[in-house]
Design a protein with these regions (language model features):
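Active-site beta-strand-loop-beta-strand hairpin of nuclease catalytic cores
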Residues: 111-120
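Short glycine-rich, acidic/polar surface loops and turns
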Residues: 104-110
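Basic, Lys/Arg-enriched alpha-helical interface segments
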Residues: 1-103, 114-115, 125-151
């Protein structure tokens, strides 16, 4: 698949593991005009569940930002942490659960392979299917705006 950038990397134990999006940078949609949708959601989440917000920020966003990539296992299994969204071409959803709030969270992002960026588009609490479809459409719309700005 073209949208998944797999890279071989040695871990500290010397074994090889597949990493997703190694060497990519992070772009938080519209943070350059002070509309950081994902960062704002995580800031609000920190007030009620700092552990989950910190986990998303440090274990996902910061690892990509530092160029380390994410483990390919996050896309595998019955309940993958990262799932490709069917409606979007290169759209993924990061799935987390806040045990403190007893709510599922979704962080939507796309992969810009040309510019080697992971573009974080939207973050929200999961609700009914209708609301989730709207959240996905919003993420797709934001990614199209991002691509238009890149031209």
């Amino acid at each position: 698949m073209k949208d998944k950038e797999f890279t071989q990397a040695s871990s500290t134990k010397g074994s090889e593991e597949l990493l997703l999006w190694k060497g990519f940078s992070v772009y938080l949609f519209d943070e350059d005009i002070n509309r950081d949708y994902v960062g704002g959601f995580l800031d609000e989440l920190t007030k009620s569940d700092a552990h989950t917000a910190t986990h998303i920020f440090l274990d996902v966003i910061e690892k990509i930002r530092e160029g380390k990539g994410l483990q390919a296992e996050m896309l595998k299994g019955k309940k993958p942490k990262i799932k490709k969204v069917e409606q979007g071409d290169k759209l993924y959803e990061l799935r987390e659960y806040s045990s403190k709030l007893r709510k599922h969270l979704r962080v939507y992002f796309s992969i810009d392979s040309n510019n080697k960026k992971v573009v974080f588009l939207n973050a929200c609490f999961k609700s009914d299917d209708t609301r989730q479809d709207k959240d996905i459409k919003l993420a797709i719309s934001r990614y199209k705006k991002y691509l238009h700005k890149q031209k």
